[in-house]
Design a protein with these regions (language model features):
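Intrinsically disordered, low-complexity non-transmembrane regions of multi-pass membrane transporters
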Residues: 136-170, 201-230
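Alpha-helical transmembrane segments
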Residues: 1-9, 112-128, 184-197, 269, ...
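Hydrophobic core segments of alpha-helical transmembrane domains in multi-pass membrane transport
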Residues: 6-13, 44-45, 85, 121-133, ...
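Transmembrane helical segments that form the transport core of multi-pass membrane transport proteins
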Residues: 18, 40, 174, 178-315
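Transmembrane helix-loop junctions at the membrane interface of multipass transporters and ion channels
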Residues: 99-110, 173-187, 378-381
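Membrane-interfacial helix-loop connectors
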Residues: 47-84, 88, 97, 101-117, ...
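Juxtamembrane and boundary regions of transmembrane helices in multi-pass small-molecule transporters
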Residues: 70-71, 75, 79, 91-92, ...
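Hydrophobic alpha-helical transmembrane segments
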Residues: 2, 37-42, 78-79, 114-118, ...
Length: 381
């Protein structure tokens, strides 16, 4: 995961260093906070369904840095990016690590998961955005100093618009290539992202070879690597090690078995797992659930003493789909509860207590609203 994060950050930094994101920011003309927040949330939600929420968060943070100069405004927008990224990843089999796990192991399928989870996921992102918009007024504060720095960048002046656009397109395609690479080769995602870095590196070297640019101005990969945020990487490593310690000690698996024995209801178990995923990583929680419950077959359901309950554990059953939703969306309730939250916290230095006081209730409202929508869907349809 850490190597994947490094690869994603290098890719995004390469695009940004060569002015690729300027094409997007130049087309975002609105200065009103409410409209901009809604636009950022929509882009993040659907981008996260194709990319993973970690990469999406990095890309969107780089975008809002070019649009917002006030760090408190960026904290609000960054928090909504976390919520939208987690919600967007929940309804797509390739949108989050947990949905990929469930999809690859045969617990869920694309044809059933998307239509069942897209509406709850939209609601889980829409409610926090609507609440947040009520507290936003006026226009955004543009980042004057940052814009001037870009204007003074000699490299960007020497690159043509089509060359900047080509770097953006190649970079985005490299990011989109990762889930395809994993599905086709069954190799870890970090190998796909490193291959994408290699492709982008090769293209920029070819670009420099054709243009008369001073060596000092060239932003080769070796220079860009030094620009990525090392503190974010170390912070992310610390979170991963802490969660892995809980997993290795058996605390998470023991709690999963206790949940099964004590609660029993598939909706309640998943809601609790979702709440827990805001404290610890959702990957070991989902892995524990997969280990506890095998995918039920028609024969197993027919032979069961309670066939209606066991049917929830068939492929695309209620338990697995609701698990994908809860584990994905529940991580938004605390900023340390998801990979997207951890990386945004590191990049923007968002205060944990600030997020808890200002955003956690919004995320909880969205989480419960989406859960209610999913439960009602199953009761009505």
């Amino acid at each position: 995961t850490l190597i994947f994060l490094i690869g994603a950050m290098i890719t995004v930094e390469l695009i940004d260093a060569h002015g690729g994101f300027m094409f997007i920011t130049n087309h975002i003309t609105t200065k009103k906070k409410k409209k901009l927040l809604a636009l950022i949330a929509v882009i993040t939600f659907f981008m996260s369904a194709v990319l993973d929420n970690l990469t999406t968060s990095i890309v969107m943070i780089m975008l809002i840095r070019k649009l917002l100069g006030n760090y408190k405004e960026r904290w609000v927008f960054g928090s909504i990016i976390i919520i939208a990224a987690n919600s967007g990843g929940a309804w797509s089999p390739i949108g989050d690590v947990t949905t990929i796990m469930l999809w690859v192991r045969g617990n869920i399928s694309t044809s059933s998961t998307i239509p069942h989870l897209i509406l709850p996921s939209i609601v889980s992102a829409l409610i926090p955005v609507l609440i947040a918009m009520r507290f936003l007024h006026g226009n955004v504060t543009p980042p004057n100093a940052f814009s001037q720095m870009e204007a003074d960048n000699e490299l960007l002046k020497k690159l043509k618009d089509k060359e900047k656009l080509s770097i953006l397109i190649i970079g985005v395609l490299c990011l989109l290539f990762v889930p395809v690479f994993k599905t086709v080769t069954h190799l870890p995602p970090f190998m796909g992202i490193l291959m994408g870095v290699g492709i982008l590196w090769f293209y920029t070297e070819m670009l420099y070879a054709r243009k008369p640019i001073d060596e000092d101005l060239k932003l080769r990969l070796s220079k860009v690597v030094h620009r990525i945020d090392g503190a974010t990487l170390l912070f992310f490593l610390g979170i991963l090690l802490a969660v892995d310690a809980l997993r290795c000690s058996g605390v998470l698996s023991d709690f999963a078995f206790w949940l099964d024995d004590t609660v029993g209801n598939v909706y309640a178990v998943n809601l609790i797992i979702g709440a827990l995923s805001s404290i610890v990583d959702n990957v070991p929680l989902v892995a524990g659930a997969i280990g506890m419950y095998p995918v039920a077959t028609d024969a197993m359901v027919a032979a069961a003493t309670d066939p209606a309950y066991l049917a929830n554990f068939m492929q695309d059953g209620v338990f697995w789909q609701f698990l994908a939703y809860c584990a994905g969306v529940g991580g938004s309730m605390l900023i340390i509860g998801s990979a997207a939250g951890v990386v945004v916290m590191g990049l923007e230095r968002i205060n944990f207590i600030w997020y808890l006081k200002n955003i956690s209730l919004l995320a909880l409202a969205g989480y419960l609203s989406g859960a209610v929508v999913y439960i009602l869907q199953n009761l009505i349809l």
